[in-house]
From Swiss-Prot:
It is found in: Cytoplasm, Nucleoid. One of its GO terms (biological process) is chromosome segregation. It holds the Pfam family KicB. Residues 211-239 are annotated as: Leucine-zipper. GO terms for molecular function: calcium ion binding. The keyword Calcium applies. Interacts, and probably forms a ternary complex, with MukE and MukB via its C-terminal region. The complex formation is stimulated by calcium or magnesium. It is required for an interaction between MukE and MukB. The keyword Kinase does not apply. This is Chromosome partition protein MukF. Keywords: Calcium, Cell cycle, Cell division, Chromosome partition, Cytoplasm, DNA condensation. Belongs to the MukF family. Coiled coil: none annotated. It comes from Haemophilus aegyptius.
Length: 443
């Protein structure tokens, strides 16, 4: 634990001394949120009691409650919030009119329910951009501190402070937003379950929309995290390299470790959430398909009866091809046709087993890659894959790429793998396939 953090006994004593408690019924929570929204629109951040009474009146209208004795009820509600989420100030200068301001606890609670509900790829991109700038400046300062042998004060001000009070807080905000998305996923699951239990036929389109929207949002956010994650980890490693062996800067090393763990946890849970949602998506589709299979005869017969019943309102024609085949369908002992197909298949349609393809590629790649080894030339897998995939149809690209990589890694390894730096993604075909691999330069 870094030295600026508080221990559990200290936090317990601090909360106990201030008598913190949270017991907000729905009506009081709505009242607090309304106060927070109104407070955000004011320049001075101060509110009068008349303002709070008006806000209370609006919230009661939303609950369709009586407005009788509204002033008394509003005063009771205000008194319940005072000293917990609202502070009251009064003096002789205010002539008996009290001034109200939200407490830090009130700001925190309302901020969670208002601003944290908005989680989008744009917001995440902005947050990650701010983090990248802060880490970049901190890493530059760290290298400057090493070169100039700066004092501990320099490291605390220019390296520790930005990481602790900017980067770490944004990571916590992203983590909190992910937890809110977990709640949203659960609410969507409940909504889908309710739709399917009522009328699954009418609910299919709604379920598809909810599933697709959630899958798209999760994938978009995870792509944004993945795009920035490697660069952020690389910058953190730069700072960590600067403090290695410096016992006086242990607090920075511990903070870097915490930030790396947070970033790994955020990215890992984002991918895990996608995998879990994909599993749920498949489960729902399987349920729908099963329901359709069990109900298809009744649905078809019902539609057929309706179409015949309304034939004169909306006449229709049934077009058939080879009508005698339709008559044959009534024969319960019909024998399947076993006519042999004669002639030769075009070359494009001829079957080639995967084992034959594997042997051909292995033989070719061994001859190609051994030349690299004999001449001690590095193997750029992305370039080799790109050149070789051009010789094969798209349907074989996956198997060909797998075989090439398998043969290449048997010859040697990449020194960059030991540095902890992630390689860049490189395109290997025209359909958007990419590979992430260091150059093999050690045999």
């Amino acid at each position: 634990m870094i030295e600026t953090s508080q221990t559990i006994p200290e936090l317990v004593s601090w909360a106990k001394d201030r008598e913190f408690s949270l017991n907000l019924p729905t009506e009081r929570l709505v009242f607090l949120l309304a106060i927070a929204i109104y407070n955000n629109e004011r320049l001075d951040g101060e509110m009068l009691e008349a303002d709070l009474v008006d806000i209370f009146r609006h919230t009661m209208n939303a609950f369709e409650q009586s407005t009788d004795a509204i002033a008394t009820r509003a005063n009771n509600a205000i008194n319940e919030l005072v000293n917990n989420v609202v502070n009251r100030f009064s003096s002789e200068f205010t002539e008996g009119l009290a001034i109200y301001r939200l407490t830090p606890l009130g700001v925190g609670v309302s901020d969670y329910y208002i601003r944290q509900r908005e989680f989008s790829a744009l917001r995440l991109s902005v947050q990650l951009s701010i983090v990248a700038d802060e880490i970049q400046r901190a890493s530059d300062s760290a290298e400057e501190g090493v070169e100039n042998n700066e004092s501990e004060h320099f490291w605390r001000r220019n390296v520790f402070a930005p990481l602790k009070y900017s980067v770490a807080e944004i990571f916590d905000s992203i983590d909190l937003s992910q937890r809110i998305m977990d709640e949203n996923q659960q609410s969507i699951k409940d909504e889908i379950a309710e739709l399917l239990t009522k009328d699954w036929q009418a609910a299919i389109s709604s379920c598809e929309r909810l599933l697709d929207e959630t899958s798209g949002n999760l994938r978009e956010l995870q792509d944004t995290l993945n795009a920035a994650g490697d660069k952020l980890q690389a910058q953190l490693l730069r700072i960590q390299d600067c403090v290695i062996g410096r016992d006086d800067l242990y607090f920075i090393d511990q903070l870097i470790t915490d930030l790396q763990s947070k970033l790994d946890r955020i990215i890992s849970w984002g991918q895990q959430a996608i995998d879990l949602w994909i599993g749920y998506d498949r489960h729902v589709h399987k349920f729908i398909r099963t329901a359709i299979d069990m109900d298809k005869n009744r649905v078809f017969s019902q539609r057929l009866r309706n179409s015949i019943h309304h034939y004169f309102d909306h006449p229709w024609f049934l077009w058939t091809a080879q009508a005698e085949r339709l008559v044959d369908l009534r024969d319960e002992e019909m024998v399947l046709r076993e006519d042999d197909a004669l002639g030769e298949l075009p070359e494009e349609l001829q079957y080639e087993s995967l084992s034959d393809l594997h042997d051909q590629i292995v033989e070719h790649m061994q001859g190609l890659l051994i030349a690299y080894r004999e001449n001690n030339r590095p193997i750029d897998l992305s370039l080799v894959l790109k050149e070789q995939l051009e010789n094969y149809p798209l349907s074989r690209h996956f198997d060909v790429a797998r075989i090439i990589v398998d043969q290449a890694v048997r010859l040697g390894m990449a020194n960059d793998d030991l540095s902890g730096i992630y390689p860049d993604w490189q395109a290997i075909n025209k359909r958007g396939a990419e590979v992430q691999a260091h150059v093999i330069d050690k045999y």
